[in-house]
Amino acid sequence: LKSYPKAVVAVSHDRMFLDNVVDVVYEIEYGTARRYPGNYTNFIARKKENYDKQMKDHIAQQKEIERLQRIVTRFKGKPTKTSMAQSKQKAIERMVIIEAPDKYDNKTFHANFQPEKETGNDVLYTSELAIGYDHPLSVVSLDLKRGEKLGILGGNGLGKSTFLKTIVGKIPALSGEYRFGTNVQIGYFDQQMAMYTSNKTVLDDFWDEYPNLTETEARNALGAFLFSGEDVFKNVNMLSGGEKVRLALCKILKTRPNVLVLDEPTNHMDIVGKETLESMLKDYKGTLIFVSHDRYFVKKVATQLLVFEDGTTNLYQFGYEQYQEKLDREASESKNVYRGNAIFGGAISQNGGSQKGRGE
């Protein structure tokens, strides 16, 4: 798409894709379409700048109007000051009013999701851990410490979800070992939870997990994950995939685990949902292990990166940026080799042609 010579219109929740491909963003919000030159990251920065400037100008203008209005009120009844009052009134009337900017979509999860207790410093250790079903898909060795956030990337079918299922005890390891440290309490999100079905309401479904809560306590917990008002009486089967993810996360985080294991938590979320979850996980004081295809999300949240590649795994202890540097370096080296081969091949062809000419 970057090399396509004609226009491209793309609708996407993939922010990395938008960063890499587009050179202008149109945002449709509050019934208005606004144009922002540049990619997605540039759009976010410009939107914030525009919001801040408009709010600053709006506040300044309102203060000036109030100041002028006080003068008008003070002097409009005094004959010697009537002209001054009229002048200030006209100044107010001539102003082009700067409206307050539309609010950001500032919906955020506001639960107390921080761990109830700390783990020891050593959280997860794996040594030559072979994961898979009939045969090994990958082998994983790592040593994860308290508070670290491990993002996991890789192609389909290489064992990312299988690794998570193995360490939470859903399936057995084929060989090798893994162990968790002391005081570990795991909260596990399976991507299939986004497909969860139930004929119950959101409130009743949540109550099944926490029957000892009062209605007020249950509704407060759900409200923290954006289920407010009549939303709690929606049938679970009528929820979107993103709403089901929020319900699942609410159930999980209500236990306040100190280790979160999440398998593709953003798959069904829109950009606002992803950015809200990003903010929550960045603030999370426990240890995080998560699989995601969303590179933008991984880059924002992960402090370390584990990449699954054709039966092997590589750990990047400095996160996504270190991995990207490696990809850029390999791409540059490959390009140089290609250029070298092209030049070398051209030289041989020219020599061959010269020799052939002389022979003739």
Regions found by a protein language model. Name each.
Residues 1-56, 107, 111-360:
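ABC ATP-binding cassette signature C-motif
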Residues 47-71, 75-101:
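Intracellular alpha-helical coupling/juxtamembrane segments of multi-pass membrane proteins
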Residues 80-83, 105-106, 161:
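Short low-complexity stretches enriched in small and charged residues
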